[in-house]
């Protein structure tokens, strides 16, 4: 398990130090500073082994968090703890900075006492921690026996992520399906690689201890070995099934229900949380197709034409569209003509940046450019970097659909019909590139 936890600033000075095992000495602090923070070359690996000691580290702004151990531990568990620790600190005092850590060092030590027990991660749910650790410290002497028993039951009980007695004047539930679509396409329009990374993020403002049930597409296939393809016309009609390569859930989800019924049943935490994270490579709806045409006119001129086609329902609007067309290093001037939006040549970035505010589905637009080149003695041909694209669309490129979202609360006097529910789909570009 974790032998010690250290938090450093950008200079390598220790801001927080907590040692849980006798085999971790003061030399471990100096070893990390010298070999990682002050290393001549940037250390890319998140795990560094120094003298039979393993350092697992993450960086937030200019702050380093390092977990140290001499045992053979589960690396995924250690990183999960480090990221959870970052989330907890952010929830308590906002941005993780040197000033905030110094101003809240007593609070951080109190949090570590609860989150880590002899190096073993325990309760890291922010909602549960905030019931008995406040930014003013623990006020145990002012709490009644009833309040203290509620805290004990929450921390040690089955539902550690939600406290009892929550009340709202209006019960609301917000669900966001957030997806990032990644694509690499050949100049001929052949998909070389494509995948979607998705998250289901919820905000729950519900009274009592409700039971929520969330259903997706009629058929969900979990396929960890299958190789996925893509489809260009899937966006024109709703898909009844979706193949998910892998997925992870918040601890509140009852996995047995998902395995048998493919429905997600859970008692939600209060406030905002990530319910589910998934990845898919099959039957992806590609929101845009980029068709490039590059023609060399002698050695001092290039003619570029790029057509973008939207591939989704005409009733939907894509926003924040940006196409980046790379130019050679010896470019001397560019003349641009575009049908829609605004285009500008940025010499510092060696690219033509074409921006369109909005674009409806099943439409197309194009840009033409004449690129003047300076004579050069370099015999190497221009490598032609891929054309990249950014956008935001109001649907899920994976085809994921929310079929129902139900809330049950047996003890309080409200039903599913009394809950105001909001469902939103947002698809964004990840690395969306087309070779030219």
UniProtKB/Swiss-Prot annotation:
Keyword tags: Cell membrane, Coated pit, Endocytosis, Lipid-binding, Membrane, Protein transport, Transport
GO biological process terms held by the UniProt record: clathrin-dependent endocytosis; intracellular protein transport; Wnt signaling pathway
Subcellular location per the Swiss-Prot or TrEMBL entry: Cell membrane; Membrane, Coated pit
Entry superkingdom: Eukaryota
GO cellular component, one term: AP-2 adaptor complex
Domain MHD: 170-435
Pfam families: Adap_comp_sub, Clat_adaptor_s
Residues engaged in binding a 1,2-diacyl-sn-glycero-3-phospho-(1D-myo-inositol-3,4,5-trisphosphate): 342, 346, 355
Membrane topology: Peripheral membrane protein
Endoplasmic reticulum listed as a keyword: no
A GO molecular-function descriptor: lipid binding
Protein task: Component of the adaptor complexes which link clathrin to receptors in coated vesicles. Clathrin-associated protein complexes are believed to interact with the cytoplasmic tails of membrane proteins, leading to their selection and concentration. AP50 is a subunit of the plasma membrane adaptor. The complex binds polyphosphoinositide-containing lipids.
Assembly, per entry: Adaptor protein complex 2 (AP-2) is a heterotetramer composed of two large adaptins (alpha-type subunit and beta-type subunit), a medium adaptin (mu-type subunit) and a small adaptin (sigma-type subunit).
Protein name: AP-2 complex subunit mu-A
